[in-house]
């Protein structure tokens, strides 16, 4: 079995055809490895923009891709053709789903369908790595994962597609376990895969929603582990509910914060606690930026 870890860079631009903003892919970077995670080949292609004429200042600063590089790039359709050959029958991996969604968006623009017929097997590498290093309330970025795993990133160009794919590989190597990886395989030839990718995560903000359970609203005391009692009503703020709690066993008081996200798989409950004199840390707000 072979794996291809893909990273993309794209530029947010306005599309007249779509009458809206569009994430135009400007660079492909990928690394192919065998079942021992030894590198077999790498892939790097810059795409000449055909929708937006200028890169946003944010993309310029992040990627350092020059106008000269873009001018020498290939068309998007040519880039995809090259990547198809590179991918072959390998299992595709990306860090999170944003790259897959960008591929689907660009495929829809150029071919009229968002189905990626050249992808058979898929693994969300971010989800796989989070099973070990999981911080409650937020997704793990690639740089954070590398830092937690003690990976030396010197000499790598962050936010360049090939280097980011190699960094993702380094994380994968540290955590690889053949048996533990199996549950993360997805069949990208099935309708269910695209239904899942298209599903928009939403924040549930009605406590009477039948999808929510009473047990989800309980908190354990962070000091002694006993079930705490809520003091007062729930307050909804910054996309989450919060309330004061007191432990009947040790008398400890703390603030509890809870967020409900409706994902394709169902409701995901995320909780944080903090001492009463503190505000709960802003993990959940940060998660909103890239959660899917």
Outline where the language-model segments fall:
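Metal-dependent phosphoesterase signature
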Residues: 61-79
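Alpha-helix initiation/capping motif
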Residues: 19, 69-72, 135
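A broad, low-specificity signal marking well-ordered, structured residues that form hydrophobic/aromatic
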Residues: 3-4, 43, 219, 245
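Short, well-ordered turn and helix-capping elements at secondary-structure junctions
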Residues: 10-12, 49, 129, 232-234
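Acidic two-metal-ion nuclease catalytic site recognized across multiple nuclease folds
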Residues: 174-292
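Entry/capping segment at the start of metal-dependent catalytic domains
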Residues: 1-27, 31-36
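Metal-dependent phosphoesterase core characteristic of DEDDh/y 3'-5' exonuclease domains
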Residues: 21-26, 32-63, 84-204
